[in-house]
Amino acid sequence: MSKRALVASLLLASLICSPVRADPIQDLQTLVKQGQFSQALERADSILASKPRDAQVRFLKGVVLSELNRSAEAIAVFQKLTEDFPELPEPYNNLAVLYAQQRQYDKARIALEMAIRTHPSYATAHENLGDIYARLASQAYDKALALDSSNVAAQNKLALIREMISVAGKPGRPVAPAPVAAAPQANKPAAPPPV
C-alpha cells in the first residue's frame, strides 16, 4: 500500500470512527424532552448567542422558562416572538396560557384571538379560547351576584360554569415541551402539536 493510500485510509477510518456531532437544536430538544430545563436554558442561550433570531430556539427558551416557573421572562420571550414573527400562532398560544395562569383573562383572550387569526385551524388555540371564555363568564356571574345576591339565574349559571371548569381542569394548554419538533419555524406556521 502506498503512503498516500495509507494516509487516505487512516483519514477515512478516523472519519468513520469519530462520533458525529449532533445538531445543537436536537440537543436542546432532547434536554427539554428529558426535563433537564436548567441545562436546556444554558444550551438555548448558547445557540442564541450565534443565532439570535432563531424562532425555534427562542420558542423553546420560552417553554423552558415556563417550566422553570420564570413566567415574567417567558412572557417577554413569547411577546418578542409575536412581534418578530407575527405569523406564528404558537407563541401567542403560550403567551395566553401564561396570562391565564396570572388570571389576566382579557390579555389571554387577545393573544388567543391573534393565534387563531394567524392559523384558523389551530385547534389548541380554539380550545384554550373556550376555556378563557368560561373564566370570563365566571367573573361576570360573580360580579352579577356581588351586585344582586338573590339572582337565581346567575347563581345557576355560575354553578354550571364552575362545574365545567372543575371537570375540564386547568385553563389553557401550552404548546408542550414534548412535541418540540413542531416548534415554530420562521417561514411558516407549524401545525399545532398534539397535546
Predicted regions and their residues:
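Register position in tetratricopeptide repeats
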Residues: 33-34, 67-68, 101-102, 135, ...
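Helix-start (N-cap) detector for alpha-helical repeat units in TPR-like alpha-solenoids
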Residues: 55-56, 89-90, 123-124, 152
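Compositionally biased, proline/threonine/alanine/serine-rich low-complexity intrinsically disordered stretches
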Residues: 42, 73-76, 159-195
